[in-house]
């Protein structure tokens, strides 16, 4: 089956999403001291988190906010505004004063929602400016221990011999794991039935109970079950193997395949570039600290710390990629 992405587009996506990382941010970023941003911030700062408290993304938000608070000598308040697949919180950021005192955290829904939801109260590109992609969240495919396959190649072969027989669960329709599964189906040329759940836990329950064949989920969410022998790790979805683990990637069977959940900071589009650069530079400095990197990696993430321009480009490339997957798979928001 013809891949959804030409090889050139894939290389651009991989470049935007991983290779830039920490090594090149300083050269590409505008000066943080330009335009009088050196005394930023002069007042308390609000970090909008568009999902409920708890989980790895919230942990990273709080870790970074505490470090920025120390650097800036101003409170950095984490304000939770969940709902509508993150659209409520993102809209709050889009409509906030463009003074740098309000910025927000986003995940992959930021790039998916323009295609998944019929109407958004903001324009993802026109109303919001990327500050930095903080990290990628590692994703994985797991199976029941008694599944008749143990590798991705065996899974694909089994699925082709038994079309429509396999079922897989995800934390919800339109989630990055769901989109990754649909992309895998199309690139590998097989079919399986999707069962969306309200979060990871019920999907795990169904797999453990033998009522599902597979689950696509964040790596750390399923790792304890794999270690206990209650689930079988088939593959991870990132470009490279998860550091410290020997589990194979999908890309080792399907070169160029790469899906992970992004985590980043955005600001109102009219925020002065020097202020955006200041937030980016200080966030990147925080992420360069060995202890912070270790704690982010403990949440199942790979540190990226891209520049504002790199993050904007990556979001737009992800919007293009997922728009096509959503249209071809007929995916709708729950």
Give, region by region, the residue ranges found by the protein language model.
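Hinge/capping helix and adjacent helix->loop/strand transition within the periplasmic-binding protein
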Residues: 95-101, 115-202, 250, 255, ...
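A ligand-binding cleft/hinge motif common to bilobed small-molecule-binding domains
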Residues: 110-119, 183-187, 213-247, 323
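N-terminal (or domain-start) structured segment
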Residues: 29-126, 165, 190-213, 305, ...
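Sec/Tat-exported extracytoplasmic proteins
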Residues: 68, 72, 97, 105, ...
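An extracytoplasmic/periplasmic, membrane-proximal ligand-sensing/linker region
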Residues: 42-44, 186-187, 227, 273-334
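N-terminal secretory signal peptides
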Residues: 1-8, 12-24
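Stable alpha-helical elements in mature extracytoplasmic
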Residues: 56, 60, 64, 89, ...
